Regions:
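Surface-exposed, proline-enriched loop/turn segments that connect beta strands in immunoglobulin-like
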Residues: 100-101
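Hydrophobic cores of alpha-helical transmembrane segments in multi-pass integral membrane proteins
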Residues: 3-26, 36-57, 69-91, 105-128, ...
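Membrane-interface segments at the starts/ends of alpha-helical transmembrane spans
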Residues: 1, 65-66, 137-140
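Interfacial helix-loop-helix junctions of multi-pass membrane proteins
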Residues: 127-135, 139
């Protein structure tokens, strides 16, 4: 799962962060909170994700140093991941009132919240003592589903709600 985790992480994290960084400011009609934070968090994710894969191979025949390295890099991923989450939520500073009536922003806030929860769970589950309890349980399955359905699906639905009316020359879905 070393390669698999990195492939999933890059396809389901980096690409959808791009969707968030494009559509969230468009819909909120505000600039992204911190361009510098977005650059820093993206490149830190790229650097750290490469070595995060071994956290799925704890308590296997993989050498201990590799398992420890994977665990360490996974825990370190919490910082850049939450940098992206905070950047997304802070972009809405001054536009939280729009959340009451705007379904696109609702989908995006739910997605960003799931991204935050998922990226908190992942590093915690990578810690050896937590992994000993959580491995081979439904917690791992729930973690994957919160990332895939909560983060990826919700940000995608929000983006589709933004794009579909514009494809047909309208400003809003209804």
């Amino acid at each position: 799962w070393w390669y698999g985790h990195n492939a999933v992480g890059f396809f389901l994290t980096a690409g959808f962060l791009g969707i968030m960084y494009y559509f969230l400011p468009k819909q909120a009609q505000l600039p992204i909170y911190s361009y510098r934070l977005s650059i820093l968090h993206f490149w830190t994710l790229v650097f750290l994700y490469i070595w995060a894969g071994p956290h799925h191979l704890l308590y296997t025949a993989l050498p201990d140093w590799t398992q420890t390295l994977g665990m360490t890099f996974s825990v370190m991923l919490l910082v850049p991941s939450w940098g992206g989450m905070v950047n997304g939520l802070m972009t809405l500073k001054g536009a939280w009132d729009k959340l009451r009536t705007d379904p696109i922003l609702k989908f995006m806030v739910v997605a960003i919240s799931f991204y935050g929860m998922s990226t908190f769970e992942g590093p915690m589950m990578a810690i050896r003592t937590v992994n000993a309890l959580s491995h081979y349980t439904d917690w791992g399955i729930g973690h994957v589903h919160s990332g895939a359905l909560g983060w990826v699906a919700m940000i995608s639905i929000g983006a589709l709600y933004y794009m579909i009316p514009r494809v047909f020359g309208k400003k809003e879905m209804y």
